[in-house]
Amino acid sequence: MRTFSPKLLLLLLLVLRHHAESGSIVKFLPGFEGPLPFELETGYIGIAKYWANDERVREALQIRKGSIGKWIRCNSNIHYDDDIISSIPYHMNNSINGYRSLIYSGDHDMEVPFLATEAWIRSLNYPIIDDWRPWIINNQIAGYTMTYANKMTYATIKASGHTAEYKPAESFIMFQRWISGQPL
């Protein structure tokens, strides 16, 4: 049985990825005689989960054996226009009853990207009273914020992911300022 270099195989896959339908099985590659000695499914997830867990690939990337577990792709889709319908009535009710609300997004959040959050906030059509501006911690931009007439504040946290744990200090200061009624 002929063995293939993981680096060479990856290079071929990158070059040929536009010639295959997503989710199809590749049985032959140019430059190699006969069928491939393994099943190769095209598509980012189909290839990546096998390639990233291959011991030869890990060795070539100098990943120490046992230092990390099995590589698993956690999110195959990034939805820039997610509509969080269930949140809209909740926030409208807060506004009608005069409650303040804080909505925040990490600007590196790939679970619910900040563009999706901004889209559903815009759909509320609330007047803006403090337009888009940076909020600062120790003379550094920590994110951007906007305040609406209905006592709703929207903020982003720079270089943060989906939850506060990605930027705990910035998240704490943002919440501390908001809960005490200070501008971000």
From Swiss-Prot:
It is found in: Secreted. One of its GO terms (cellular component) is extracellular region. It comes from the Eukaryota. One of its GO terms (biological process) is flavonol biosynthetic process. GO terms for molecular function: serine-type carboxypeptidase activity. Residues 1-22 form the signal peptide. Transmembrane segments: none annotated. InterPro entries: AB_hydrolase_fold, Peptidase_S10. The keyword Heme does not apply. Glycans are attached at N93. Its main location: secreted. Pfam families: Peptidase_S10 (PF00450). Keywords: Glycoprotein, Secreted, Signal. The keyword Secreted applies. Belongs to the peptidase S10 family. This is Putative serine carboxypeptidase-like 52.
